[in-house]
Amino acid sequence: FFAQLKLPLSDADPDYPALVLGNEILGGGFLNSRLATRIRQKEGLSYGVGSFAYGQSADQIGGWGAYAIYAPENAARLEAAFREELDKMLKEGFTDKEVEEAKKGWLQNNNVTRAQDGFIAGKLEDHLTYNRTFKWEEDFENKVKALTAAQINAVMKKHIVPGKISIVKAGDFEGAKKKAAASGKPDDKPAAAGTPKN
């Protein structure tokens, strides 16, 4: 399962810090994220599920996406759960508690990553290419630290448009149907009516 949404923004866009932290809460934080809690822990539909956000440094090219590993017979249930969590985020937003916990996790992960020589070398190369220094990284972190739930919710509603998300599902669906027929179990329920077809 792979979902992708292209966004016209760079990593210097004013909305980018909020998009990054909003994604951390939705699916970037792995086990503590909303997608992992719902799809992996609650419903047991995927062992590996998450989301990501990115923005290029040179151009207004960015995006948001999500992924999940699943058994073919669970495809429709997984997509339905994914769409429900997306709708819940857009309608209800994130809480202050979720935002503060996401900040701590995101900053801690950054500290761990910066202890790796390969990461530092890559960043130095990027900074030379885009005429930046580590002061840029510090400023970005400070922007993330200053974010409120209201700011993040506004940015997520602005950029994450369900109808514009492309979804790709791959798997042995015919094999799953034959297996279900042989066992006498009904096929997986289809996605909820009214959801966009991809």
Show where each model-derived region lies.
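His/Glu-based metal-binding/catalytic segments typifying zinc-dependent metallopeptidases
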Residues: 1-32
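M16 family metallopeptidases and their MPP-like homologs
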Residues: 1-10, 36-146, 162-171, 178-195
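PPIase-associated folding chaperone regions across multiple families
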Residues: 14-22, 144, 148-151, 156, ...
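Generic solvent-exposed, charged/amphipathic alpha-helical segments
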Residues: 22-23, 36, 40, 83, ...
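Conserved catalytic core of Hanks-type protein kinase domains
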Residues: 25, 127, 159
